[in-house]
Swiss-Prot record:
GO terms for molecular function: lipid binding. InterPro entries: DegV, DegV_C, DegV_domain_contain. Hexadecanoate binds at residues 61, 94. This is DegV domain-containing protein SPy_0865/M5005_Spy0672. It comes from the Bacteria. It comes from Streptococcus pyogenes serotype M1. Keywords: Lipid-binding. PROSITE patterns: DEGV. Pfam families: DegV. Residues 3-280 form the DegV domain.
Length: 282
């Protein structure tokens, strides 16, 4: 079995995997004032925040190119790849996952699977890493898919944002529109639910209380198993440091990896968002 893993630019990959020849990534466009950008090509994350601050309109994103994925699958076939797993941004907040399922019929020479990751960022990158590791350990394709589904089912993220406008106006928050007029008195905690949608999980009165509540939620989640924990933020270093300190003060003794949301996810969360992601160690 020669396996390739395809993902998208919302996945935060471990440094040692960024040049791995078995990993392929599709760019997701970010549109600001009718100009199209691709992070890492013609847009740095610092430039993104500056352009977002300067613009009168909220940025938008589009889906990766279907034709690019179709062409990539043809290229992989010509290079002798026999199996492909595609792991992309949660189907609950992007239509891309639903739109690509037909491609398996277009490339019958490759055995492929596109499971819904139901997540993004560092937990998505962790899934990509695990799939490659399992493949190189000699696991069968079906065994990899079974184990991957176990990881997907055990993965989630909880988020606190400064401004719900990005999520609601972008159509990425399933049950948040009623909160827009009430943000002065609450600080909503959001989560990725079982369908990969971002939903309001709980309403807390202040940011400080919300941060403490995030720690309580995290400790409850990881009490019954072994998990990798990520603190993820969009230009909110002070909040990330504070959340990490609260975690350590609560007795958490394991490594905590800190990463930044890329431009695509920061488009929907806005500047100042803080989150934690958890994914099981398998």
């Amino acid at each position: 079995m020669k396996l390739a893993v395809i993902t998208d630019s919302t996945a935060t990959l471990p440094t040692d995997l960024k040049q791995d020849k078995a990993i392929f990534s599709l760019d997701i466009p970010v549109i600001i004032d009718d100009e199209t950008y691709f992070e890492g090509r013609n847009l740095s994350i610092d430039d993104f925040y500056q352009k977002m601050a300067d613009s009168q309109n909220l940025p938008k994103t589009s889906q990766p190119s279907l034709s690019e994925l179709d062409n990539l699958l043809g290229l992989l076939s010509s290079k002798g790849y026999t199996h492909v797993i595609g792991l992309f941004l949660a189907g609950g907040i992007s239509g891309f996952w639903q739109n690509i399922q037909f491609l398996a019929e277009e490339h019958p020479e490759i055995e492929m699977a596109f499971p819904d990751s139901k997540i993004t960022s560092a937990p998505l990158g962790s899934m990509v890493k695990n799939v490659l590791d399992w493949s190189r350990q000699g696991m069968t394709f079906q065994a990899i898919l079974n184990k991957l589904q176990e990881q997907i089912d055990g993965t989630t993220a909880f988020i606190m944002v400064d401004d719900l406008n990005h999520l609601v106006k972008g159509g990425r928050l399933s049950n948040g529109s009623a909160l827009l007029g009430n943000l002065l008195s609450i600080k909503p905690i959001l989560r990725f639910d079982e369908e990969g949608k971002i939903v309001v999980y709980e309403k807390v009165r202040t940011e400080k209380k919300a941060m403490k509540r995030l720690v309580e939620i995290l400790n409850d989640l990881i009490a019954d198993g072994q998990y990798n924990v990520f603190i993820i933020h969009s230009k909110a270093q002070d909040k990330a440091d504070y959340l990490k300190r609260l975690l350590q003060d609560s007795g958490y003794q394991y490594d905590i990896e800190e990463v930044h949301f890329g431009a695509v996810i920061a488009t929907h969360l806005g500047e100042g968002a803080i989150a934690f992601g958890v994914t099981p160690r398998l």
